[in-house]
Amino acid sequence: MSYYLLPLLIFYFGVMLCIAYGGTNPAVILTCSLPIVALAVLRGHSGTDTAAYYQAFTDLGQGNGYGAEPLFNAYAQFLWAVYPDPRFVVNGISMTTALLLLWSISRSRYGIWFGGLVLVPGMFYELTMNVMRFGLASAIFLLATRIAPHRKPVRYVIYALIGTCVHFSSALLFLLFVATTRRGHTLMIVGVAIVVIGISLVMPDYFSDKTSLYTGMAAPNASSGLLFLLIQLLMLTVMIVYRRQFAIPPIGWLICAVLAVALYGITQVTYAGIRFQLILVNLMLVMLWRQFSPRNRHMPASLATWLFIIGLIALAGRIHNMSDEEGKGESPFLPYQTAPAIQELG
């Protein structure tokens, strides 16, 4: 576990330096994030889904891939053309995701608080070493929201198409972000439902494959999904308590609350609900981040404390899951393994 915690402590040190400085410092962030990037990029069989990606990318030379998303597989094919090794492809995707996430943090005035205190400790390892398709798509979503969708709608649509072609489910991020942050977009909610229903009719084989992934993985008890629900409720509390600091309309609170309860209900039926909970957590964090507009341009100490606590809870949950799955499966997070070529150097 120390392999994961020590790089995070170094990153936290950089976060504290930036907070003392009064804002995000790109040089400090990028320097102090080198250990966590190296951990993800130089790994071997570590990360729950890593083995599955290795297996799928073994056949890239024959035109095969992982999933049905065209741009994700096109990028994998590009990396394969650079160096035909499934490990290089997997770790290349991890590096791309890591750099995009950290670049977004370093280029945002308030990135050090929302990205540094919540995103990195709570989700960095998950996005770069496990759910890699969604990880890359969520990094693209973070780039898309740097500029408000209503200011440059064409730009946002282009990013949305790219993100969706990297991971189909990430379309929900782009649609729901507009629905939750812009007044008068209630019809967007109906649009989301129509799009999802339409895709399910046009692409039944894709949804059938997604469903089969979770066969036999039904949630064992009421505690399944409880951590994500707690994080979502804490974020919702922050939205409401500090509502004058965030440009989020009440309809946004309502949508998040309804989705949080509904997705928790799904986790009691199937493990797939937990993956959708991750999408909602990501959405709510970006809502807080991009819609933060304090009148005096300063981060309130009490709000920063809330974010720190949310990040610690998310990190504690990640550590618990890693420990619980230690030694299980083909590529668990624990014990951490470096790439074979690095192991040979030792």
Feature-to-residue mapping (PLM):
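Signature aromatic-anchored transmembrane alpha helix within multi-pass, membrane-resident enzymes
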Residues: V190-V195, N296-L315
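Membrane-embedded helix bundles of polyisoprenyl
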Residues: W113-V131, G135-L142
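Transmembrane-helix signature of polytopic, membrane-embedded enzymes
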Residues: T24, L102-G122
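Loop-to-helix entry region of an early transmembrane alpha helix in multi-pass inner-membrane enzymes
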Residues: P70, V82-T96
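Alpha-helical transmembrane segments and terminal signal-anchor/GPI-anchor hydrophobic tails
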Residues: A27, L42-S46, A51-Q55, L60, ...
